[in-house]
């Protein structure tokens, strides 16, 4: 009798690490994108929490007038924010080691740049991780495509807009009131409400909410009865069951009679594609709008576009919005400018006769 002994090569440490990283059996999938996502998002989150609680005031306008944003310096949850990096830094890469001291780094708003850049890397990797997990499971890639809309929006306000305006100080502050301030100033300087891409974004968000509510209520109203009156209707569903849990024909018939026949989907797949695509495309357009307005390709200007036969201006809603824009513009960064940009751009009249 002859025994044949086969020497099995033990898998290398690197091979086991690769298998663990890409395993779909882990409770939470890591993936190669996760290797970068986890440290960047942890860094952004940690610095955000510390800075929101304890960061000293930041000289956002670069004029030696620091603005307080943290809780320990007098703010609450509503008014608090991570103040954007100083206009004195502009678009320069400003890590801690570029400052003369940590105090200088904090005074110039270094935490904002650190948080934003790590956050954008992290959410981009999260999107890649969605694609990676879909690929491993043999799924189609549209989850990552849908997530690209909020990623594009965040990239627009935190990176593209500061690049276009020439300074991270023009980025969106990381806080509730700071976000509202960003929106108001954006309207004042770019007339975003009159930009078609913003209008498409509004239609996408509000339309998506409407369609989500319509779909959820139609499905909930046409569930196939599996329970008694004394049980929750939710008990009639078992995870993984093969049968439909609602009657799409009944839902189609109801909605087709409520509006008209062709307003109602008769294909569940095309319906769900529509529910995903509508808000995603709208938010894509808004991100594109922010990115074009970053370089001052602004919303429509219909100011004083209606005049009577004598040449006198008949005010329209556009003129009311323009007046509001001017009011908002003269109030923001009030000590940084003598005049708002669009008023200072007009040639001054001669004073020497």
Swiss-Prot record:
E.C. number(s) listed in UniProt: 1.10.3.9
Transmembrane stretches, start-end: 29-46, 118-133, 142-156, 197-218, 274-288
Keyword field: Acetylation, Calcium, Chlorophyll, Chloroplast, Chromophore, Electron transport, Herbicide resistance, Iron, Magnesium, Manganese, Membrane, Metal-binding, Oxidoreductase, Phosphoprotein, Photosynthesis, Photosystem II, Plastid, Thylakoid, Transmembrane, Transmembrane helix, Transport
Classification via Pfam families: Photo_RC
Gene Ontology BP term (one): response to herbicide
Membrane topology of the entry: Multi-pass membrane protein
Positions bearing the site annotation: Stabilizes free radical intermediate: 190
Binding, [CaMn4O5] cluster: 170, 189, 332-333, 342, 344
Residues bound to Fe cation: 215, 272
Modified residues (N-acetylthreonine): 2
Binding residue positions for chlorophyll a PD1: 198
Note describing how the cofactor binds: The D1/D2 heterodimer binds P680, chlorophylls that are the primary electron donor of PSII, and subsequent electron acceptors. It shares a non-heme iron and each subunit binds pheophytin, quinone, additional chlorophylls, carotenoids and lipids. D1 provides most of the ligands for the Mn4-Ca-O5 cluster of the oxygen-evolving complex (OEC). There is also a Cl(-1) ion associated with D1 and D2, which is required for oxygen evolution. The PSII complex binds additional chlorophylls, carotenoids and specific lipids.
PTM comment: Tyr-161 forms a radical intermediate that is referred to as redox-active TyrZ, YZ or Y-Z. C-terminally processed by CTPA; processing is essential to allow assembly of the oxygen-evolving complex and thus photosynthetic growth.
Chief location of this protein within or outside the cell: plastid
Modified residues (Phosphothreonine): 2
Subunit structure and binding partners: PSII is composed of 1 copy each of membrane proteins PsbA, PsbB, PsbC, PsbD, PsbE, PsbF, PsbH, PsbI, PsbJ, PsbK, PsbL, PsbM, PsbT, PsbX, PsbY, PsbZ, Psb30/Ycf12, at least 3 peripheral proteins of the oxygen-evolving complex and a large number of cofactors. It forms dimeric complexes.
Miscellaneous comment: 2 of the reaction center chlorophylls (ChlD1 and ChlD2) are entirely coordinated by water.
UniProt xrefs under NCBIfam families: psbA
Family: Belongs to the reaction center PufL/M/PsbA/D family.
Name of protein: Photosystem II protein D1
Organism: Lepidium virginicum (Virginia pepperweed)
Gene: psbA
């Amino acid at each position: 009798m002859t025994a044949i002994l086969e020497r099995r090569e033990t898998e290398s440490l690197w091979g086991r690490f690769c298998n663990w990283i890409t395993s779909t059996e882990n409770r939470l999938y890591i993936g190669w994108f996760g290797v970068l996502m986890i440290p960047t998002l942890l860094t952004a989150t940690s610095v955000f929490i510390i800075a929101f609680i304890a960061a000293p005031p930041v000289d956002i306008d670069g004029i030696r007038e620091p603005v307080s944003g943290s809780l320990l310096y007098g703010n609450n949850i509503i008014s608090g924010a991570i103040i954007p990096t100083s206009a004195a830094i502009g678009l320069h890469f400003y890590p801690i080691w570029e400052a003369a001291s940590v105090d200088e780094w904090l005074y110039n708003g270094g935490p904002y740049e650190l948080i934003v850049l790590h956050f954008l890397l992290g959410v981009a990797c999260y999107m890649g991780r969605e694609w990676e997990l879909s690929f491993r499971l043999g799924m189609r890639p549209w989850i990552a495509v849908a997530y690209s809309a909020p990623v594009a929006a965040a990239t627009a306000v935190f990176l593209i807009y500061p690049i276009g305006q020439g300074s991270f100080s023009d980025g969106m502050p990381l806080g509730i009131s700071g976000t509202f301030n960003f929106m108001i100033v954006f309207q004042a300087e770019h007339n975003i409400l009159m930009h078609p891409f913003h209008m498409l974004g509004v239609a996408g968000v509000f339309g998506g909410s409407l369609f989500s509510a319509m779909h959820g209520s139609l499905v909930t109203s046409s569930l196939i009865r599996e329970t008694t009156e004394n049980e929750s209707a939710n008990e009639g569903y078992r995870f993984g069951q093969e049968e439909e849990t609602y009657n799409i024909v009944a839902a189609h018939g109801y909605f087709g009679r409520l509006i008209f026949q062709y307003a109602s989907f008769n294909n569940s797949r095309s319906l769900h594609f529509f529910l995903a695509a509508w808000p995603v495309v709208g938010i894509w357009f808004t991100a594109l709008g922010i990115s074009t307005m970053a370089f001052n390709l602004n919303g429509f200007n219909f100011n004083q576009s209606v005049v009577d036969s004598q040449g006198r201006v008949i005010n329209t809603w556009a003129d009311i919005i323009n007046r509001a824009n001017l009011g908002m513009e003269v109030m923001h960064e009030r000590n940084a400018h003598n005049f708002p940009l669009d008023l200072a751009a007009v040639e001054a009249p001669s004073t020497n006769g």
